[in-house]
Amino acid sequence: MTKFLLPLLALICFGVNAQVQKEIFESFKLQERRGVSYYFPEDYTEDKKYPLILVLDADYLFDLVVANAKFYSEHNRMPQAVVVGIHQSENDIRWEDCDYEQTTGLPTEKAKLFYEFLGTELIPYLETNYNIAPFKMFIGYDITANFGNYFLFKDTSLFNSYLTISPVLATEMESRVPSRLLDLDQEIFYNLILEKEKTDGRQQILQMDNAIKSITKDNIHYFFDQYDEPDHISIAAYGISKAFDNVFKLFRPISPKEYKEKILKSEEPVFKYLEDKYARIEDLLGFEKAVELNDVMAIYAGSAKKEDYESLKELAKLCKKFYPETMMGFYFEGEYLELLGEPKKAMKAFEKAYQMEEIDFLTKDLAIEKIDALKADFGY
């Protein structure tokens, strides 16, 4: 039994630049060795924080989740994330790990231990040894999808987001999940994926869906997607990308539609939209996101179109912080001062911009044009 006294030390160390690694984790709670797969972004760094995606049924789902996470992060549609998968196919142990009492719907004794393994051993180990952000996502399928719901019943949910794929719901879960979501004050994303094929538990799932849909709290974000083609097996391959879209929509760069409908039509200062967007990202994910060039240009265009000069001033300050080597900050400052009727100060700002790196449409030639125009107009 002594081999279980230091369960975490049995996790073999590896370089995080190795993108995917499977290791054996010795669990004190389970008194078992469990196969765990890890994915770290190729450019993982101690300077950033990464959301954690926990995947049960890793033998089937881990590669699918990693592929989607890589694709979405590479196209800037979600942050880079650490993905951890628990292997449960050997001896069909997934049913033991996630089983529940038929009469009460509560986890069996073995399932309680598995719950403790995840919540008090594996995740704390990752949080201690790697730069894990506060935002955590749970992904499960069938019986393992139902198991994720038990994490909702803590005073504070361990996970901020749940992807529940065609769940085998425990007794009374169709009422317990909506009731718990209604009571929670923290922000929760709950994605339910279902096939249209008739299954034994389909009506129970639809009852839960209807109950959750009736919740009108701002902190609960519920998404239900039902697919025509897949059956109960193939449904596991559906919905992961849709769930990432639902959860990380805010993380995406400002789109042309967003620009037209939310920035140009808003009565508030243009810069406030950018400020609120990035503050919301930080609140949700637990880390500051560097402001995207696309978003800078959207706010610049909106400020010009709406003649919102104060937003241009704030944008200049922001660019000096996030793009300090480029000419953006001083160029935008120069335009602001020019519009404010401060030609001497504007010219100095453009001169500083000229000495810095070009970016996007901002070139040294453009800065010279501004300087020459001011000299011609005011005789400097």
Annotate each language-model stretch with its function.
Residues V16-P51:
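A domain-start/cap signature at the N-terminus of enzymes
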Residues T156, Y323-P324, E358:
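Short coil turns that delineate tetratricopeptide repeat
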Residues A170-D231:
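The feature captures the conserved acid-bearing segment of alpha/beta-hydrolase catalytic domains
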Residues K217-R280, L285-G286:
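C-terminal catalytic histidine-bearing segment of alpha/beta-hydrolase fold enzymes
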